[in-house]
Amino acid sequence: MVESALEPNITTKSVGQAIRAHLRVLKLTKKPSREEFLTIAKVAGAGILAVGAVGFIIYVLLTMLPQWVAK
């Protein structure tokens, strides 16, 4: 009885519906142009750098601030 409670309720009908939904989305997609890809890459890179810069600033503040306060 415990084993049946742990097994997910997956049927062939639900799997088929999920596959059809994924295929429908894939049919609507297209390969991005080179310009579109480069734009997306630049934006993603800028976001990564921004998050890294914020993290570095927080790190520097948390390591230097106690030294400044202790003086």
UniProtKB/Swiss-Prot annotation:
One of its GO terms (molecular function) is protein transmembrane transporter activity. Gene3D superfamilies: Preprotein translocase SecE subunit (1.20.5.820). Its main location: membrane. The chain crosses the membrane at residues 43-63. GO terms for cellular component: plasma membrane. One of its GO terms (biological process) is protein targeting. Pfam families: SecE. Component of the Sec protein translocase complex. Heterotrimer consisting of SecY (alpha), SecG (beta) and SecE (gamma) subunits. The heterotrimers can form oligomers, although 1 heterotrimer is thought to be able to translocate proteins. Interacts with the ribosome. May interact with SecDF, and other proteins may be involved. Essential subunit of the Sec protein translocation channel SecYEG. Clamps together the 2 halves of SecY. May contact the channel plug during translocation. Belongs to the SecE/SEC61-gamma family. This is Protein translocase subunit SecE. It comes from Methanosarcina mazei (strain ATCC BAA-159 / DSM 3647 / Goe1 / Go1 / JCM 11833 / OCM 88). The lineage of its organism: Archaea, Methanobacteriati, Methanobacteriota, Stenosarchaea group, Methanomicrobia. The gene is secE.
